[in-house]
A protein has these predicted regions:
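P-loop/Walker A NTP-binding region and its immediately flanking N-terminal helices
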Residues: 1-174, 178-184
Length: 188
């Protein structure tokens, strides 16, 4: 009976908005947007390392693409939410801006954007460390952000929003995450 090894950060990573600690100003605003059906097409989460930017983007993706979504009240065994948690969803693509800073990856993304989601409501692109994209890649991305298809959502995470082109920032709903006080972390 072998127990699979799991990195502690993954094991305890929040899976729902109510599990996220110290970022209620972000999770409540996103919850309200879902409940009021007022969804933007692009979001940017900025803040220091370890504050939950990518985690919140993943949870938000689960809310948007849950079987009965968009909803924050998806069930624990929702197959679409599970796929996203396990990194198996073909409709939620995560890109690491630090290692994929080339124009080719963004051009590839622009080709993919044209196609409807396979089994979900939205095709979601989560780009981590988006500030690491090259200027040429930003410009290629901008074309898609200017006229995004209805079925596409972008979620960007960055520790350095000043390095993101203003033309990109202006097309995103921005959330600034705060450093989480140690006392708050200890309580959880």
């Amino acid at each position: 009976n072998s127990v699979a090894y799991q990195v502690i950060a993954r094991k305890y990573r929040p899976q729902r908005f109510e599990d996220v600690v110290g970022q209620e100003h972000v999770t409540q605003t996103l919850t309200n947007a879902i409940e009021q059906k007022r969804l933007a097409h692009a979001y940017i989460f900025s803040g220091p390392r370890g504050t939950g930017k990518t985690t919140i983007a993943r949870i938000f993706a689960k809310c948007l693409n849950a079987t009965d979504g968009p909803t924050t009240k998806f069930s624990d065994d929702d197959p679409r939410a599970k796929e996203i948690t396990d990194g198996r969803s073909i409709d939620v693509l995560e890109i690491d801006g630090a290692s994929n800073n080339g124009v080719e990856q963004v051009r590839e993304l622009r080709e993919t954007v044209k196609y409807m989601p396979a089994s979900s409501k939205f095709k979601i692109f989560i780009i981590d460390e988006v500030h690491m994209l090259s200027t040429a890649a930003f410009n290629a991305l901008l074309k898609t952000l200017e006229e995004p298809p209805e079925h596409v959502k972008f979620m960007f995470a960055t520790t350095d929003p000043e390095k993101v082109l203003p033309t990109i920032l202006s097309r995103c709903q921005r959330f600034d995450l705060r450093r989480i006080p140690a006392a708050l972390i200890v309580k959880h």
